[in-house]
């Protein structure tokens, strides 16, 4: 799934659209990538002398990947980030890195989904979390 297809599902736009491409997708699993560039707006303040991609944005990218796993084009709902448990950050993400997001659906009921999530760079885990993602009606 390319960026144009992603934009048909997610409401996010620059600078908060944090998934560049979905490389695998099924009903209970998805893999995505985010190319971290030196021109990311977040590096203006985090941190200019030694830029590190903010951990909160890694988690948001994982949540967006979960939303893309759960939803399809043309649905009149949007994903909403409802909760996070057990978030752990294990390594820095720097300009030039390719973030690999991977999510697995563990439970789905009452419009909510519990998702296990891992972010990697070059196969090395940089973050893990359990996410709660809901859906709400899109009122365009």
Curated annotation (Swiss-Prot):
One of its GO terms (biological process) is lipid A biosynthetic process. Pfam families: FabA (PF07977). The active site is at residue 46. Keywords: Cytoplasm, Lipid A biosynthesis, Lipid biosynthesis, Lipid metabolism, Lyase. Its main location: cytoplasm. GO terms for cellular component: cytoplasm; membrane. GO terms for molecular function: (3R)-hydroxyacyl-[acyl-carrier-protein] dehydratase activity. Belongs to the thioester dehydratase family. FabZ subfamily. This is 3-hydroxyacyl-[acyl-carrier-protein] dehydratase FabZ. It comes from Pseudothermotoga lettingae (strain ATCC BAA-301 / DSM 14385 / NBRC 107922 / TMO) (Thermotoga lettingae).
């Amino acid at each position: 799934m390319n960026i144009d297809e992603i934009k048909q599902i997610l409401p996010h736009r620059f600078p908060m659209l944090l998934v560049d491409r979905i490389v695998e997708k099924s009903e209970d699993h998805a893999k995505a990538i985010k190319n971290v560039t030196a021109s990311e707006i977040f590096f203006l303040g985090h941190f200019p002398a030694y830029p590190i991609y903010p951990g909160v944005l890694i988690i948001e990218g994982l949540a967006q990947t979960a939303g893309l796993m759960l939803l399809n084009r043309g649905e009149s709902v949007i994903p909403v980030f409802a909760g996070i448990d057990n978030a752990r950050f294990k390594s820095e993400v720097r300009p030039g890195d390719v973030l690999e997001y991977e999510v697995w659906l563990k439970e789905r009921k009452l419009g909510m989904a519990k998702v296990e999530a891992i972010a990697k760079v070059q196969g090395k885990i940089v973050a893990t979390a359990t996410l709660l993602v809901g859906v709400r009606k899109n009122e365009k």
